[in-house]
Amino acid sequence: ANWTNAVGFAMIEYAKFKVGGTVVDEQNGLWFDIQNELTDPNKKQWPLVGKVDDPLKLKYFQTKSTKYIIPLRFSFNKSPGQALPIFLTGTDKTEFEIEIKFRSLNNLLLHHSGGTVNTASITEFKAHATYYSLENYETTRIRNYRQTREYNNGQLIHLIETVQPFTFNSGNIVLDD
């Protein structure tokens, strides 16, 4: 058995981005795959998500564990200019969540010999993100003027000064069958 093509995208039934408990964007694995087809002409992300250009490559029995890196392309994170200003969302809460529902692994396996595989599992899940924060005076200025950019002599000035990368780790993943 082997994973279906683009298994990284196929395993995502949906991914929701929530701010203060409210869903502000929701995508599914098929849409992530379509976005990849439209925005990755050189196929650089294909190895990251288990995607191949020839379906015959999926006929080989896979016995090794694999690692996939799945970019979650929500509407606000395609480029830094589309970043979501959380403090302008109308809520005092700055908490945000990403909720991901995975498909059953049995639906992601290709069985070419008619056999079954009972050992497929997700053993680890990590989410990586970059969080940008503004200085207090910048936040106040943006709230007052509702402008996220300024132009000086035709050049764009970015207001973001602090970058804080973080990693979320989850030990146990529960999949719906």
Regions found by a protein language model. Name each.
Residues A1-D177:
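Short, low-complexity Pro/Thr/Gly
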